[in-house]
Amino acid sequence: MGLSDQEWQHVLTIWGKVESDLAGHGHEILMRLFHDLPETLDRFERFKGLTTPDQMKASEELKKHGVTVLTQLGKILKLKGKHEAELKPLAQTHATKHKIPVKYLEFISEVIIKVIAEKHSADFGADSQAAMKKALELFRNDMASKYKEFGFQG
């Protein structure tokens, strides 16, 4: 299920636009995730007190975590599927410490695509969206495989 060179080019081109404002994109993605799927907030002990959109919007901690999430995802995407070394420690913490189910990775993937489409509609057409979907699916599948190695069936 690898991506073609052209698909990776689509992914990395749009990711360059995301990187131009990691804080804004990351904050928006997490706010949208927690708003649209409130059960995901239960996995984040430090954010449980953020119950309103205004609280989420004002949270520097949430913004900072959004940068962390997108920075890590960007590193993985730039490896174009050759991400074993980068993915393993991420999968280990998500499986053994945070216990984040794979379905939550699906949820955030959908939100990432929605937010990029809203913020960069002119640059994120059908081909780019399909390529990003495929890249995020590759990431999720590889995370799920690693989860099993760590004994987490999430």
UniProtKB/Swiss-Prot annotation:
- Name the residues that bind nitrite: 65
In which compartments does the protein localize? Cytoplasm, Sarcoplasm
Q: Which Gene3D superfamilies match?
A: 6.10.140.2100, 6.10.140.2110
What catalytic activity does the UniProt entry give for this protein? Fe(III)-heme b-[protein] + nitric oxide + H2O = Fe(II)-heme b-[protein] + nitrite + 2 H(+); H2O2 + AH2 = A + 2 H2O
Task: State where heme b binds.
Answer: 94
Transmembrane feature ranges: none
Query: Which EC numbers characterise this protein's activity in its record?
Result: 1.7.-.-, 1.11.1.-
Positions of the Globin domain? 2-148
Q: What is its main location?
A: cytoplasm
Which residues are recorded as binding O2?
A: 65
Q: Name one GO biological process term.
A: removal of superoxide radicals
- Show the GO MF annotations: heme binding; metal ion binding; nitrite reductase activity; oxygen binding; oxygen carrier activity; peroxidase activity
User: Which PANTHER family does the protein's record reference?
Assistant: MYOGLOBIN
What does the sequence similarity comment in the record state about its family? Belongs to the globin family.
Know the name of this protein? Myoglobin
Q: What is the lineage of its organism?
A: Eukaryota, Metazoa, Chordata, Craniata, Vertebrata
